[in-house]
């Protein structure tokens, strides 16, 4: 996110982004993002060119301390840039309530910026014309330097003088122009000896003819420094008098830049703004893991093809616990990581890697146990480490907690692991705690058939290619497919037959029971998905219709305002003619022709009324 900001102000904010649990504040952040996304499509993103983090300079702008010219140049550039951002904010749609509220804190400091620019230029140098006094002093310095130059040039053209010098060049000592006289020719050039070289072989002499001129330049340099200090103090005082408003503006610009970064981030990763659900229901449509999206983009740069398979996930509507089963490397872990990231991003006020219409609750806690987190220092086994994490989760499990567990029951005897896994799932169900768990233990599948608030899911497996498709199928338990895969890979039929004989009767009964309900479950899931898709489409069309209606109403208001304005036009009124970008004066109005005759200086022209806008009366 920090890579998508426009300036250092936004970067500092982006690096502090983290999930929170205040729903009102999350709603505000997401509304700001939505409004910026819409604004970017109509008036573009705010122009941040020239904005710098000048907060430290503004804080230290306390007389008698003076800011340096380089600092003032950067401050001027930043304050000048706020003028363009204020103009951008004035163009926002009336519906952009959050952005308009934020931009009310952005002041227009163009007047102060102009004051600073009259003192320092863009390179951080004090301008010659910063004041009449400074121009006069610098002009006199330049003239005195020219006169000294003439004196030195004349001396260096004298071949006797050049023989007395160690080298035929003038140099400076304490702002005084001196000549490098060889010590053996001491006294040959009338003047003042200011110093000698370390060896004593060279004496640095100020020619007598240049002494008065050098004295005058030193006096003028002092006057120059005094005047510059006065000017810098004046500029610093302007900042001091407005420092609170400027700091508030910079804080608002930092937030605005962060919102812009979110929009750029969303465009690059194809993210969407989630809705916050009030009933605790989680619905993710076409969710993708951001790192997989990044890997896909990197592959495209190398002209390689890489698919990112989206998943649809729901939780909390007709079930609280989703048990994802199936073989390893099938995408189970990626699924729960995708859900975890989507929820955390939403609660940080960020767009999420899912489609429009996705809804996310505000969880008070999100617990994730993924992979082997055993601690060598505590000498914990894989299972012990896993169990320790689960115990922490269970103490905090409640309806506002999201629990995500990878490979529940792993790391120990499969039967005992499955028993513990079932007990943990039942505890989560009893607490109405929303959870997603992955496992390769088949015994956990049966829970969904006896617990009404539990549901199975699997990562789809292509039996033809013997590869997972990575699609998440809710309502269908997964299978390891180990025997089928072994058979397709050519394991001898005799061994396959023996392997099937070793399958337990309970396993076979469960498999037959699952197969018997699978078709009806698929049909029900398909019907539910189609109904939800239709509902989302209706919502999308409703929102689009409301926006179109609002746009028409705004145009109607503008038209009515224009009609009222045009109807009130009288001879002598000042108007702006858009076609020529010039102002003029109404001579007469021809409402029947929707035209007006306008005097624009030397000419009178007949202009369509639609090209006119009223101007305030002239002060003349």
Segment roles from a protein language model:
Residues 269-270, 277-517, 521:
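ATPase nucleotide-binding head domains, primarily ABC-like/P-loop NTPase cores
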Residues 1-137, 242-263, 270, 286:
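Conserved amphipathic alpha-helical "coupling/scaffold" segments
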Residues 450-455, 459-620:
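Conserved core positions of repeat-based scaffolds
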Residues 169, 173-205, 214, 276-310, ...:
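SMC-family hinge/dimerization module
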């Amino acid at each position: 996110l920090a890579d998508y900001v426009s300036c250092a102000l936004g970067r500092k904010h982006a690096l502090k982004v983290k999930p929170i649990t205040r729903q009102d504040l999350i709603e505000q952040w997401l509304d700001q993002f939505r409004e910026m996304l819409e604004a970017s499509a109509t008036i573009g993103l705010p122009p941040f060119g020239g904005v710098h983090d000048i907060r430290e300079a503004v804080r230290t702008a306390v007389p008698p301390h003076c800011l340096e010219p380089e600092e003032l140049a950067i401050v001027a550039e930043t304050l000048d840039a706020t003028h363009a951002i204020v103009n951008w904010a004035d163009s926002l749609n009336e519906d952009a309530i959050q952005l308009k509220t934020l931009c009310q804190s952005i002041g227009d400091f163009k007047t102060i910026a102009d004051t600073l620019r009259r003192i320092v230029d863009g390179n951080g140098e004090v301008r010659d014309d910063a004041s009449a006094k400074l121009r006069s002093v610098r002009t006199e310095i330049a003239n005195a330097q020219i006169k000294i130059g003439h004196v030195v040039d004349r001396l260096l053209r004298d071949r006797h003088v050049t023989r007395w010098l160690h080298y035929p060049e003038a140099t400076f000592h304490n702002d005084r122009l001196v000549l490098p006289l060889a010590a053996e020719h001491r006294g040959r050039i009338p003047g003042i000896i200011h110093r000698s070289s370390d060896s004593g072989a060279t004496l640095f002499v100020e020619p007598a003819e240049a002494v008065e001129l050098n004295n005058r330049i030193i006096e003028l340099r002092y006057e120059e420094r005094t005047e510059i200090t006065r000017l810098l103090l004046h500029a610093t005082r302007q900042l001091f008098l407005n420092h609170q408003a400027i700091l508030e503006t910079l804080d608002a610009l930092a937030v605005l830049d962060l919102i812009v970064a979110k929009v750029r981030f969303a465009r690059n990763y194809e993210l969407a703004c989630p809705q916050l659900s009030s009933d605790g229901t989680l619905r993710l449509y076409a969710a993708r893991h951001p790192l997989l999206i990044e890997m896909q983009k990197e592959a495209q740069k190398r002209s390689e093809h890489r698919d990112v398979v989206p998943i649809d996930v729901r939780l909390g509507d007709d079930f609280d616990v989703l048990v994802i089963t199936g073989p390893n490397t099938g995408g189970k872990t990626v699924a729960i990581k995708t859900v975890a990231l989507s929820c955390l991003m939403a609660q940080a006020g960020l767009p999420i890697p899912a489609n429009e219409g996705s809804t996310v609750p505000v969880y008070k806690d999100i617990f994730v146990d993924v992979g082997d987190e055993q601690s060598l220092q505590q000498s914990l086994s894989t299972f012990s480490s896993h169990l320790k994490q689960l115990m922490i989760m269970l103490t905090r499990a409640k309806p506002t907690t999201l629990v995500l567990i990878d490979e529940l029951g792993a790391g120990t005897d499969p039967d005992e692991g499955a028993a513990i896994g079932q007990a943990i799932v039942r505890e989560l169900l009893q607490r109405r705690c929303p959870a997603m768990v992955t496992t390769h233990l088949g015994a956990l599948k049966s829970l969904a058939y006896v617990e009404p608030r539990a549901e199975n899911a699997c990562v789809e497996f292509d039996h033809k290619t013997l590869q997972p498709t990575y699609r998440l199928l809710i309502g269908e338990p997964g299978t390891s497919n180990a025997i089928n895969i072994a058979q397709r890979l050519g394991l001898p039929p005799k061994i396959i037959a023996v392997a099937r004989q070793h399958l337990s009767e309970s396993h076979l009964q469960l498999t037959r029971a699952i197969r018997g309900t699978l078709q009806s479950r698929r049909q029900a899931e398909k019907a539910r998905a189609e109904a939800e898709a239709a509902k989302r489409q209706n919502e999308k069309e409703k929102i689009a219709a409301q926006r179109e209606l609002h746009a028409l109403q705004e145009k109607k208001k503008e038209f009515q305002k224009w009609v009222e304005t045009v109807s009130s036009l009288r001879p002598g009124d000042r108007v702006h003619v858009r076609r020529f970008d010039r102002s003029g004066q109404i001579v007469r109005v021809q409402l029947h022709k929707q035209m007006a005759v306008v005097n624009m200086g030397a000419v009178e022209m007949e202009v369509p009324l639609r090209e006119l806008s009223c101007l305030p009366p002239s002060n003349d």
